[in-house]
């Protein structure tokens, strides 16, 4: 890579450090919920996760992290930032292993300003940990395929087990990995031993298996339905670029083009590239794992009626970016690689900057109004309960909170067990009557609400309607779904005292 390109990559790495720790956003539902679960005593976390639907490793790590660094927004997000930062030297090592020093520089560039990795480096969730484990596991597998002795096989089993205990999409990823290794194992004894090591990692999941089966029977993803693979791919490409805006679209599909080049492209001259539809040696297996993971996840989603969120592809993003980076390193000549590198870095910087400046939730705006106008003893009604964790985290402590549907876990946590069935049985009119009964003597009733949540269609509107029939209503904060991922309306109902 020319000196100018190396300088640009070094600048990107320097920028990548603060980008993985800085965002102006308040914690949204998933983040606040993670903190509320992780702050429980370690022995209580497994039982709490039976109401949530995730494996325990990240929550255990976050519990220990918070006991040292505290529970402020920056503190709880820093664990993910450290994981995202630790992935950069592994990305360099991965690129160098498959494409030499040129590939290492390209890999470092693609990973440093990846809006996806930056976003989840600033989120109190397990996705940065997952990407780190996948990168480490890939390096362990590559080393073991060269010499499959026990010293090189044990880390593979441990990493596989850690992945399974971090996110359930690791099941689809490891299933795809097993299929690819099984294909190679027909002729390669080393691949057979690596395959056994990957499967051995499943032993670490066995103690958690009863909880996982219970979660599968009672939690799932009631907030959305299964999606088509085309939707899965297109949404993921947007998230790889940083969101739903033009620069993100260009980056996402640009990375897809580089991915295709990494799978099937080879330079044949100073200005020409040949595409071999059979794929070229080097990264066909990695590309196959990416494709098979999506295929298996799609089939599983339809079979189990579970949905997809683009953050789940954290299990395959490291391999996708690795192949794309190698594709960039295969561009011939001097000018074409520099232009492509500049495009990746500039668009990546735009997407990463968007993460810094974008608030994921309207909770902060709502809390600001409540701090300014609410009085001690006022009622804050949160409908639906999914708005509860983020709102509760930023509310003044002297306000009384009620959530709909009512739950002993709210407002700090969500009870996802049989969520759709419980919501169907909930009675918004009875809830509104209970709010009115409790409002005697209150200066105001404040309702944080949104009607956009699946399984609760029309119910929050019914609560608002019943309260409006009793008290004068004023919309204080309008719901803004164009600006915020998690959005809500704040309505004030004048109470019984002036």
Predicted regions and their residues:
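Terminal, non-globular segments
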Residues: 2-498
């Amino acid at each position: 890579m020319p000196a100018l390109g190396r300088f640009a990559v070094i600048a990107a790495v320097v920028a990548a450090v603060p980008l993985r720790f800085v965002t102006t956003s308040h914690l949204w539902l998933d983040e606040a919920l993670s903190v509320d679960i992780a702050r429980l005593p370690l022995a209580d976390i497994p039982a709490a996760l039976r109401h949530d639907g995730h494996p325990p490793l990240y929550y255990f790590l976050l519990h220990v992290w918070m006991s040292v660094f505290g529970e402020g927004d920056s503190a709880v997000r820093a664990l993910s930032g450290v994981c995202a930062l630790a992935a950069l030297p592994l990305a360099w090592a991965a690129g160098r292993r498959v494409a030499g020093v040129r590939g290492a520089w390209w890999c470092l560039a693609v990973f440093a300003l990846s809006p996806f990795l930056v976003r989840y480096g600033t989120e109190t969730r397990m996705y940065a940990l997952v990407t780190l484990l996948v990168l480490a596991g890939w390096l362990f597998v590559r080393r073991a395929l060269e010499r499959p002795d026990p010293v090189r096989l044990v880390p593979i089993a441990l990493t596989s087990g850690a992945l399974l205990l971090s996110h359930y999409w690791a099941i689809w990823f490891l299933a795809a990995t097993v299929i690819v290794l099984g294909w190679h194992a027909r002729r390669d004894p080393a691949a057979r031993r690596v395959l056994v090591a990957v499967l051995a990692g499943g032993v670490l999941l066995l103690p958690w298996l009863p909880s996982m089966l219970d979660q599968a029977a009672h939690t799932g993803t009631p907030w959305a339905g299964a999606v088509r693979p085309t939707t899965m791919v297109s949404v993921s490409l947007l998230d790889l670029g940083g969101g739903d805006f033009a620069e993100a679209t260009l980056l996402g599909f640009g990375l897809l083009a580089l991915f295709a080049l990494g799978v099937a492209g080879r330079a044949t001259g100073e200005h020409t590239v040949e595409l071999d539809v059979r794929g070229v040696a080097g990264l066909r297996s990695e590309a196959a794992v990416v494709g098979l993971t999506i295929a298996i996840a799609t089939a599983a989603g339809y079979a189990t009626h579970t949905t997809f969120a683009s953050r789940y592809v954290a299990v395959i993003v490291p391999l996708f970016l690795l192949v794309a980076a190698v594709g960039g390193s295969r561009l011939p000549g001097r000018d074409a690689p520099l232009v492509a590198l500049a495009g990746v870095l500039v668009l990546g910087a735009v997407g990463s900057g968007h993460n810094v400046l974008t608030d994921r939730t309207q909770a902060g705006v709502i809390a600001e109004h409540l701090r300014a106008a609410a009085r001690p003893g006022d009622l804050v009604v949160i409908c639906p309960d999914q708005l509860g964790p983020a709102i509760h985290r930023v509310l003044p402590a002297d306000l009384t909170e009620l959530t709909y549907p009512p739950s002993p876990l709210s407002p700090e946590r969500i009870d996802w067990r049989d969520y759709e069935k419980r919501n169907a049985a909930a009675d918004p009119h009875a809830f509104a009557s209970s709010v009115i009964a409790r409002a005697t003597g209150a200066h105001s009733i404040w309702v944080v609400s949104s009607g956009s949540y699946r399984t609760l269609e029309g119910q929050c509107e019914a609560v608002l309607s019943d309260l409006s029939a009793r008290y004068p209503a004023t919309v204080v904060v309008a719901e803004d779904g164009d600006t915020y991922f998690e959005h809500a309306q704040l309505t004030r109902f004048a109470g019984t005292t002036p």
